Amino acid sequence: MNIDIISVGKVKEKYIKLGIAEFSKRLSAHCKLNIIEVDDLSAAENLSDSEKEIVKDKEAEKIISKIKDSHYVITLEIVGNQLTSEKLAAKIENLTIQGHSNICFVIGGSLGLGKSVLDRSDYALSFSKFTFPHQLMRLILLEQIYRSFRIINNLPYHK
């Protein structure tokens, strides 16, 4: 199983970097993990809606260039499907049974994801109706992927 995580922007906070490193190490026993960062574009607070779309479209071009034809693409979206940890584990397990050995999770930048990425998405996943910083979302996603593999393999993991 290959899992790629494409994320807009770099992680700057040390505590988040440490958490990402820890879960990346733990996941190495269950899958081949590849974290891909694409540069975010600076977005001023007072951008018009059309300017926001331009920023999202430019970030989307960078994201799309990293997505392979063989990827099953799961985008993280506020309006996506909200799952329990057990249901996410079942989703990942079912994808492998269906022959999808390359899963790609996509985390957008501060303005969200551009239309071309949303159109390429095979599944929209939401962790909450809350908005999270994309750096923190990367850590939360890694923890949930790790938890999923523990559930799939009937291994203990704290609740």
Curated annotation (Swiss-Prot):
Cited InterPro entries: Alpha/beta_knot_MTases, RlmH-like, tRNA_m1G_MTases_N
Recorded catalytic activity of this chain's protein: pseudouridine(1915) in 23S rRNA + S-adenosyl-L-methionine = N(3)-methylpseudouridine(1915) in 23S rRNA + S-adenosyl-L-homocysteine + H(+)
Location within or outside the cell: Cytoplasm
Binding site for S-adenosyl-L-methionine: 76, 108
Catalytic EC class: transferase
Gene Ontology MF annotations: rRNA (pseudouridine-N3-)-methyltransferase activity
An example Gene Ontology CC term for this record: cytoplasm
Self-association and partners: Homodimer.
Function: Specifically methylates the pseudouridine at position 1915 (m3Psi1915) in 23S rRNA.
UniProt protein name: Ribosomal RNA large subunit methyltransferase H
Gene name, Swiss-Prot/TrEMBL: rlmH
